[in-house]
Amino acid sequence: MLAETIAGYGNFTLIEGDVMKLPLAEVAAEQFQGLEPVLCANLPYNITTPFLTECVRAGCFRQLTVLIQKEVAQRICARPGTGEYGAFTVLMQYYTEPELLFEVPNTCFMPPPKVTSAVVRCVTRRERPVRVVSEESFWRTVRAGFALRRKTLVNSLQTGWQLPKERLAGIVESCGLPPTVRGEALGLEEYARLADALAAAE
């Protein structure tokens, strides 16, 4: 039906398929050569996190404006030290500048879902907010930092870095962080500084 509806429009291309299997960067380069495309979508809640992760890492959209579950929107825009703040937050804020625009109550849908939704705009950063020696070490540190949320950062880091606990504690303190700090308390700058120190020590 949609194909018939847009048949007369030369500026509309319908691509049918599973978006999670779509090579986004290739499609964007082919369809929007020389342009800075934006993405607007009402995302299925079950693919929100993996789809947005793929989008921001591909870097093929200037901006993403999406309708998603409110709880996920809050995670994207969360600040260090809050319950919503996590590795996904760091990922989204590393690649984009996110802003929660407004909430959408479940009464706007038929049938109404059991959750509230929200619209989030994520503008792709022209430059990374922090500089790191190695992005691989940075993400390794971020993943480890949130691996054991109820434990101290030193304990969590052991899941990703094969260094003695005493050595890890020394590195954490050398970065100006208290030995009892938890991973969710660190912002992007602290994670960048810590990742560089860990990479140098390994």
Locate the predicted segments by residue:
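Catalytic cores of RNA-modifying enzymes
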Residues: M1-R140, E173, E184, R193, ...
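Conserved AdoMet
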Residues: L153, L177-A201
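An accessory alpha-helical subdomain
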Residues: A118, C122-T124, V130-L168, C175-P178, ...
